[in-house]
Amino acid sequence: MNDVDKTLIKKLAERASELGGRAYFVGGIVRDEVMGRPIKDVDIEVHGISETILETVLKEIGKPIRFGSAFGVYSLAGHNIDIALPRSERKSGAGHRDFDIRIDPFIGIKEAARRRDFTMNALLKDILTGEIADPYGGTEDIKNRIIRHIDDKKFGEDP
């Protein structure tokens, strides 16, 4: 992550906070930091603000590209940063892609993290405070070198 990316990310987090939301690093970036590994990609999840407001904020700090319309996922042109709203997923058919997606910026950390595969990938880190949210015990699993899925049913739906 370069200095320009760090500046954009901080602006996003500050603006989200001003509007009543919170921006978190999620998934692999947090896992890799906890494990002492180099960061490969940057994934951010913004809680507590609507999609319309998020789009406005992204336009203030860069050129947003919406590439996962059903998933509420954006990127900023020229930057390797993915920004998403929290969502839940429910299996709706037999196929690998048969899921009902519900974007909901207000579902909370635990429910948003529930859709992830393993506890170590369900970590969130508040961008402004540095506080790590660990609703499923991922840091302890990393420490103990355990790979544990979060939810039997969801893991069986998309192994």
Regions found by a protein language model. Name each.
Residues 1-159:
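Catalytic cores of the polymerase beta-like nucleotidyltransferase superfamily
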